[in-house]
């Protein structure tokens, strides 16, 4: 899987062009999402990718992720784990880990409540870890056999712990916590019998005097090769208005790979 390090574009123009074309060809495209059914069964997928180069260029990239989800008539729970590593000319350009747990309970056909928790580490960005939790309300705008689109809003709390103390909110800090709003939208699309797309956009305005802002956008396109194997291309953007000294505010990635459906 390819990754774009903060502030840099991929060294494979053909791959980037192909991925962009795929993304632009769809109405709205994170890593491949599990397609659940309200039958109470757990479904799991495993994804991986790697690339290596030696000679004039010395490159290595590895990515792995695991997802599990269970849905009933009234609630849905999901788990996700992801690890990403990339190096160029013997210098690490990406090294992060992400763990998530999400829960949703339907109040009726349109309205639901949600809760989620996230643990995120990004060594390149001096982030030892970020712990986040949020809860709120969502509204299902549309639901069809091929498309669904929802809006959600809530409140949560995030705490960042830094590997090296850095200046955040005008002070030298080892850790930084704040209450945040959670405002977002998410959609899934069945484009063809073998092609699915998903996108999720979330804003996190802080409820403090510093008015910090975070935003995350993730989108993916998945094309099934067999009943269990699929090719995926995904793009991710993370924005932090105050990430600390000598850290880019915007982090972006392009990732390609394969996923394997462990259970159906």
What are these regions (language model features)?
Residues 42, 58-62, 93-97, 129-133, ...:
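Residues that define the transmembrane beta-barrel architecture of outer-membrane proteins
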Residues 37-52, 75-79:
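Transmembrane beta-strand segments of Gram-negative outer membrane beta-barrel proteins
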Residues 50-54, 72, 83-87, 119-123, ...:
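Transmembrane beta-strands of outer-membrane beta-barrel pores
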Residues 48-50, 79-85, 101, 115-119, ...:
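Transmembrane beta-barrel strands of outer-membrane/channel proteins
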Residues 42, 74-79, 110-113, 145-149, ...:
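Repeated loop/turn-to-beta-strand initiation elements of outer-membrane beta-barrel proteins
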Residues 146-228:
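Outer-membrane beta-barrel transmembrane domain signature
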Residues 52-60, 88-94, 121-128, 145, ...:
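Solvent-exposed loop/turn segments connecting transmembrane beta-strands
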Residues 224, 250-264:
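Outer-membrane beta-barrel "beta-signal"
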């Amino acid at each position: 899987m390819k990754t774009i390090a903060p502030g840099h574009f991929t060294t494979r123009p053909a791959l980037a062009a192909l991925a962009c074309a795929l993304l632009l060809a769809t109405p709205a495209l994170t890593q491949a999402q599990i397609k659940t059914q309200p039958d109470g069964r757990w479904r799991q997928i495993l994804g991986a990718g790697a690339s290596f180069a030696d000679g004039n260029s010395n490159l290595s990239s590895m990515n792995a992720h695991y997802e599990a989800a269970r849905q009933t008539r009234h609630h849905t729970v999901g788990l996700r784990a992801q690890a990403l590593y990339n190096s160029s000319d013997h210098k690490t350009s990406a090294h992060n880990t992400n763990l998530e747990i999400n829960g949703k309970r339907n109040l009726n056909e349109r309205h639901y409540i949600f809760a989620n928790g996230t643990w995120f580490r990004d060594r390149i960005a001096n982030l030892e870890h970020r712990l986040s939790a949020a809860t709120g309300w969502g509204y299902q705008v549309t639901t069809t056999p091929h498309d669904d689109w929802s809006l959600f809003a809530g409140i949560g709390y995030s705490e960042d712990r830094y590997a090296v103390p850095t200046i955040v909110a005008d002070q030298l800090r080892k850790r930084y916590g704040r209450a945040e709003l959670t405002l977002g939208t998410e959609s899934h699309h069945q484009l063809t019998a073998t092609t699915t797309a998903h996108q999720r956009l979330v804003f996190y305005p802080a409820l403090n005097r510093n008015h910090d802002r975070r935003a995350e956008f993730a989108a993916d396109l998945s094309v099934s090769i067999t009943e269990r194997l699929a090719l995926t291309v995904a793009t991710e953007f993370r924005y932090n208005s105050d990430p600390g000294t000598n850290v880019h505010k915007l982090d972006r990635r392009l990732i390609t790979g394969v996923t394997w459906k462990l259970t159906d």
